[in-house]
Amino acid sequence: GLATSWDWDADTLTWTFHLREENWVDNNGEVVAPVTAQDFVDALKYVLTPDYASSNVGLVTAYVAGAEDYYNYYVYLNNANTGVVDDDGTTYTADASGVVTVTSADATAETYSPVDFDTVGVKAVDDHTLTYTLNFDFPGFLSLLSYAPYEPAYGPLLEEFADQFCTSAETACSCGAFYLAEYTPLENWVMKKNPENYDADSVYIDTVRYIYNQEE
């Protein structure tokens, strides 16, 4: 619902999305800031940051150009910095310039130079134009965008809360038909109608409450 139109360029394997004007709201339904293409970029960078342990990062690395190389480099760098040794004996070391050497148990070594996020195939062309460049022609990409790794997130909030982002209603922002008003982990969360949403007149439910089933 955040895009008004989109185009596919088969020659460059690039999807271009033209975004509508929409706002982020906080847990009280108050406007925080406009939604921009950069929010999609920031969110994807968050997903591709190993420190945040995204469980579905594979939905990005498999399809978005450069995403796998970027993610793997930072996995290897983290392993080097924390002294990880894999079960098969693989070790990781990093030099002062950030070049990581991955050495297998048979002493075979591969090196990986630092990877900049600019090499990942997601770009904010301007505030309302977003592009994704893929590894290959994948007709199902539009459906893939409904999955969590491709959702936008308010960049300044990601930066402020890091791994605590969206762990409470106070650390979240919403831009859909409903906003997160209350959240108690493993108990319940409450969504309320977002009056700022472009299609608010078509939403006839004011409050949705989810309650966890504590039974094992």
Located regions from the model:
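Short, solvent-exposed secondary-structure boundary motifs
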Residues: 1, 60-116, 166-174
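Extracytoplasmic/periplasmic ligand-capture domains
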Residues: 20-52, 108-110, 177-216
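Gly/Pro-rich hinge or "lid" segments in bacterial periplasmic/extracellular proteins
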Residues: 96-119, 127-128, 133-203, 207
